[in-house]
Structure formats: C-alpha cells, structure tokens
Amino acid sequence: MSSNSKRHSYKDPKYKNTNPVKIIPLGGIGEIGKNMTAFEYNNDIIIVDCGMSFPEENMPGVDCVIPDFTYIRRNHEKLKGIIITHGHEDHIGALPYFLREFKCPVFGGTMAIELIKLKLQDKNVPMEGLKLTTCKNGDIIRFGNAF
C-alpha cells in the first residue's frame, strides 16, 4: 500500500465477531481498463472481471497490458471462481493469460461467455478442464463456504 493509500474500515456493531471481507483491486483503479477485483473472506476468493488495457505510446512491442496476478499466485488455493460482468475487452481481455495459469470456473451472461469462448480459441487456450457457465437473471451461485 502506498503512503497515499488509506485503509477504510466500516464496523457495524451487530457484526463484531465476524472477519472482514477483503477487497483487493488487481487492476482498473485510477486507470481505464484492466478491470479486476478480488474479494476474499476467510479461505475463499472470488474475482470479478479479468480485463486488459491497451498499451501507452511509450510501450512499443506490447500488445496488451494485463492486471497484476501476484496476489492470486500467492493465494491460488483460495480461488473459487471468476464472475464476468460483461464481455468488453476491459473486463475479459486478460482471461486467456489468467486461465493458462489458474484453473477455476468462470461465470457470466450468455453474450459474455460466448465472447470468452471466442477469445480463448483465438489465443489457443486449451478448453479441456475449463468450466465456463452461462448465468441468467435470478440464478444463485455458491462459491466455496463464504460466497
């Protein structure tokens, strides 16, 4: 955490004996693109979005910029799945790189899942062992013990 960062805490007295939910931005904060946020509670992590951004002019030879996966590498055993909000590049563009390294289920709407399939095929990501689940309005999905 940089010296300018602030740690925010909200304490509701009726939840005094519970552990906090950690919100870990992995990209997309203070920038356009690379949207990716991890939510951790006890021994479970879920991720919302896994996007990319386009390189700046001073980055010759770079095709895309992806979020920093370091926190997930250190805590991969807690990872329960990824929720994709929609199929724009800044929300799904880093999935081929992420899913090569981490095998976890991916959940999203019909259009998002179809775009993800095309993206994974385009980037030659092996589909075997990957679980891509289409969700519809009203679906309830459980992740681990916490979510």
Regions found by a protein language model. Give the residues of each.
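Beta-sheet entry/capping signal
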Residues: 18-20, 45, 103-106, 131, ...
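N-terminal Rossmann-fold NAD(P) dinucleotide-binding loop
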Residues: 91
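Metallo-beta-lactamase
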Residues: 1-24, 40-52, 111-147
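Pre-active-site segment of Zn-dependent metallo-hydrolases
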Residues: 29-34, 41-84, 97, 101, ...
